[in-house]
């Protein structure tokens, strides 16, 4: 099969992951594309020749066997070499799961990796490109999405995150989960031990990673969320102090008033009067 100068585009937007377009091209000398910002992800595999990729104001020299990623929502520019212009194949894809899957590979942050035609990754890209020979049916669209999952699995297998990157990624995920729990349950009796058990982590480890990320302890963050919410609720004159106290996780309105005064330097009643006077 002649893989050069193929382009197919699809309008499939009902999947967690979908193939938007794929193709191959033998570029003319100095051929360039961009700078442009795209709304999907595109993986290129360089078959032969050389070229340059500029991303985040940093230019990479790339050659045959290299893979490069054009990320979503970031300006990119790429250009074929003047003497040895490159040829490449590419797969463009999108979907709600695309970013989280890509983040499991070092390609997501580095934007390029070196592979080869003997790799599973190249073989899987070629499998998708060869759909150019098949009619566009709903069955083939589903098959193509299945092959895209296999491609991304091969990418993660060949270029996984380093242990440090994986650790940092997991830490960020835990911190975000803690924040999500707090924002959804600040109105109840929320304890740090309960959050740690829910995430199957030790309290000391959770405290350490959360404080490192936010400069706050989990208790301090819970209080911050409760105080900011109570500040908003106090703007409604129809709500009593007791009602507001209960809504932000305090069963005792006196304890709430004390916490509010310690946090803002004034009582809830005084804060409300100042709002009404303004």
UniProtKB/Swiss-Prot annotation:
GO terms for molecular function: DNA-binding transcription factor activity; sequence-specific DNA binding. Keywords: Activator, DNA-binding, Transcription, Transcription regulation. InterPro entries: AraC-bd, Homeodomain-like_sf, HTH-like, HTH_AraC, HTH_AraC-typ_CS, Tscrpt_reg_AraC-type_HTH. The keyword Transcription applies. Residues 176-274 form the HTH araC/xylS-type domain. Residues 193-214, 241-264 bind DNA. PROSITE patterns: HTH_ARAC_FAMILY_1 (PS00041), HTH_ARAC_FAMILY_2 (PS01124). CDD domains: cupin_MmsR-like_N. Disulfide bonds: none annotated. Regulatory protein for the msm operon for multiple sugar metabolism. Activates the transcription of the msmEFGK, aga, dexB and gftA genes. This is Msm operon regulatory protein. It comes from Streptococcus mutans serotype c (strain ATCC 700610 / UA159). The gene is msmR.
């Amino acid at each position: 099969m002649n893989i050069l100068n193929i382009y197919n585009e699809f309008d499939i937007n009902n999947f967690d992951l979908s193939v938007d377009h794929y193709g191959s091209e033998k570029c003319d000398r100095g051929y360039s594309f961009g700078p442009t910002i795209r709304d999907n992800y595109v993986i290129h595999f360089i078959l032969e020749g050389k070229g340059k990729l500029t991303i985040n104001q940093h230019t990479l020299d790339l050659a045959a066997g290299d893979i490069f990623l054009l990320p979503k929502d970031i300006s990119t520019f790429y250009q074929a070499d003047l003497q040895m212009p490159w040829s490449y194949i590419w797969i463009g894809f999108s979907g709600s799961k695309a970013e989280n899957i890509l983040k499991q590979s070092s390609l997501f942050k580095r934007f390029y990796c070196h592979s080869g035609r003997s790799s599973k990754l190249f073989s899987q890209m070629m499998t998708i490109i060869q759909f150019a020979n098949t009619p566009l049916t709903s069955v083939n669209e589903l098959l193509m999405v299945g092959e895209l999952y296999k491609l991304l699995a091969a990418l993660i297998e060949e270029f996984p995150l380093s242990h440090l990157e994986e650790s940092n990624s997991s830490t960020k995920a835990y911190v975000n989960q803690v924040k999500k729990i707090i924002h959804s349950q600040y109105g109840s009796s929320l304890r740090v031990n309960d959050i740690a058990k829910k995430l199957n982590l030790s309290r000391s480890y959770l405290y350490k990673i959360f404080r490192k990320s936010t400069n706050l302890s989990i208790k301090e963050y819970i209080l911050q969320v409760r105080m900011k919410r109570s500040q908003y609720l106090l703007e409604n004159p129809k709500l009593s102090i007791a009602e507001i106290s209960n809504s932000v996780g305090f069963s005792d309105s006196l304890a709430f008033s004390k916490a509010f005064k310690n946090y803002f330097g004034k009582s809830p009643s005084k804060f409300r009067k100042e709002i009404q006077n303004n």
